């Protein structure tokens, strides 16, 4: 009897040892196969490399994150408000304490004095080169000037919308705009943009690709240019790259934490003629006062109504970061 029990025990022990050996052998074999496969893939990746030289690359990478509209009755209790105004406003008011006075007046509307920031800019052209909107809510004041009407419209179009942008190398490639939301945005001290549309044989339509003097000039010595050409047609571009940077951009939608207030002028600037601007923007309005004190008093009175037409965002627009986004 004892011999049978010992024999059974030895059989179980040998079976366990044999099963363990088989498992280890299978594990080593699988490790070998996996490591060999990874080695082959690694070596192959060194010799097989792909680079996209296409001229119509997808525009990718957004620095803006959408947030839902605030539903709080008093968002100003935990928010910041930036008020952008031209230098002429401070010059006309000529009072060293004017911002403190306005801060106290904003306090009567529920805005703590530490939540209001006054940001000065020289003029529309200068502001166009580097607009920076850092607060939860941003109100930009623009004094109407008939000679700068188009510049004001372009600036409003830029800051009232979110854009996705990629760099353009106009010296090597030709480009096309895929749809109405696709624009070329140029910024710099002096931007002159010329274009030459191409046919399917890449020959110039009404211009010579080898002679930039035959190109159509769409902008001359401007600081901000939003260029719109015929969609689906390749274009050769000539840009003053030493003083200007151009990007291939796609309009994503409204930047809802920004409002533009036009000061004076017979008509309010309208950027809704652009088919991509839908619905009609409520964040562009006009104040008809001659004196800047009157302008600021009106803004204080209606600041909460203005903010209710906006949407709080926790991100900012820095045109340098936004514009060089790849």
From Swiss-Prot:
It is found in: Virion; Host endoplasmic reticulum lumen. The lineage of its organism: Viruses, Riboviria, Orthornavirae, Duplornaviricota, Resentoviricetes. Residues 165-167 are annotated as: CNP motif. Residues 237-239 are annotated as: LVD motif. Residues 253-255 are annotated as: GPR motif. Calcium-binding protein that interacts with rotavirus cell receptors once the initial attachment by VP4 has been achieved. Rotavirus attachment and entry into the host cell probably involves multiple sequential contacts between the outer capsid proteins VP4 and VP7, and the cell receptors. Following entry into the host cell, low intracellular or intravesicular Ca(2+) concentration probably causes the calcium-stabilized VP7 trimers to dissociate from the virion. This step is probably necessary for the membrane-disrupting entry step and the release of VP4, which is locked onto the virion by VP7. It comes from Rotavirus A (isolate RVA/Human/Thailand/Mc35/1992/G10P11[14]). This is Outer capsid glycoprotein VP7. Pfam families: VP7. It comes from the Viruses. Some rotavirus strains are neuraminidase-sensitive and require sialic acid to attach to the cell surface. Some rotavirus strains are integrin-dependent. Some rotavirus strains depend on ganglioside for their entry into the host cell. Hsp70 also seems to be involved in the entry of some strains. In group A rotaviruses, VP7 defines the G serotype. Homotrimer; disulfide-linked. 2 Ca(2+) ions bound at each subunit interface in the trimer hold the trimer together. Interacts with the intermediate capsid protein VP6. Interacts with the outer capsid protein VP5*. Glycans are attached at residues 69, 145.
């Amino acid at each position: 009897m004892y011999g049978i029990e010992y024999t059974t025990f030895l059989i179980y022990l040998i079976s366990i040892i044999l099963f363990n050996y088989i498992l280890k052998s299978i594990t080593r074999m699988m490790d070998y196969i996996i490591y060999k496969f990874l080695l082959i893939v690694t070596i192959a990746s060194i010799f097989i490399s792909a680079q996209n030289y296409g001229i119509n690359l997808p525009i990718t990478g957004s620095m803006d994150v959408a947030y839902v509209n605030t539903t709080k009755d008093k968002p100003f209790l935990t928010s910041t408000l930036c008020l952008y105004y031209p230098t002429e406003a401070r010059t006309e008011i000529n009072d060293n304490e004017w911002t403190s006075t306005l801060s106290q007046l904003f306090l009567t509307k529920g805005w703590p004095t530490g939540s209001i920031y006054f940001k000065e800019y020289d003029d529309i052209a200068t502001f166009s080169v580097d607009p920076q909107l850092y607060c939860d809510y941003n109100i930009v004041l623009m004094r109407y000037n008939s000679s700068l009407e188009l510049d004001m419209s372009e600036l409003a179009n830029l800051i009232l919308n979110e854009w996705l942008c990629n760099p353009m190398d106009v010296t090597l490639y030709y480009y096309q705009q895929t749809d109405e939301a696709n624009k070329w945005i140029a910024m710099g001290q002096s931007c002159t943009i010329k274009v030459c549309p191409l046919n399917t044989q890449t020959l110039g339509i009404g211009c010579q690709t080898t002679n930039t003097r035959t190109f159509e000039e769409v902008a001359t010595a401007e600081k901000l240019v939003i260029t719109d050409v015929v969609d689906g047609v390749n274009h050769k571009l000539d840009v003053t790259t030493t003083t200007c940077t151009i990007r291939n951009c796609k309009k994503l939608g409204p930047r809802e934490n920004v409002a533009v207030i036009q000061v004076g002028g017979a008509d309010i600037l309208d950027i809704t003629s652009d088919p991509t601007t839908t619905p009609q923007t409520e964040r562009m309005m006009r104040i008809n006062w001659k004196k800047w004190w009157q302008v600021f008093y009106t803004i204080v009175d209606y600041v909460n109504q203005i903010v209710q037409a906006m949407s709080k965002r926790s991100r900012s627009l820095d045109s340098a970061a936004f514009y060089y986004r790849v």
